[in-house]
Amino acid sequence: MAEDRLNEYVQKMKVADGMLIGSPVYFGNMTAQTKAFLDRAFYVARANGDMFRLKVGAAVAVNRRAGALDTFNEINKLYLISQMIVPGSSYWNTITALKPGDIATDEEGVRTMRTLGKNMAWLLKKLG
């Protein structure tokens, strides 16, 4: 059986000022692995005094066609119910790709990610 490293990752999330969590989109939503990880990590955080409260969190979704906004929204729901602060960008934090390297062809998606990075860095600096 594989070693469960959830507690290790939760501790890293606990000490981080912010987190950027993303998922590829499979069958219209985040992957099962991402969903399982997030449900477990955020349950632990909530059960331990809302340990992610007031941290900065950004969601990113990579899709081929549909489901990016569903994935984006599901991650943001976890941030918001955990009392986290979510920075915005110039568009939804999604990027379109089918295979490795394809993201470079989504110019709007790349611009959105750059803006998100700048906005997240600005917010972290202001809160720090």
Regions found by a protein language model. Give the residues of each.
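Helix-loop-strand module that forms the ligand-binding subsite of alpha/beta enzymes
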Residues: 1-85, 90-91
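Glycine-rich phosphate/pyrophosphate-binding loop and the adjoining helix
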Residues: 2-8, 15, 81, 85-128
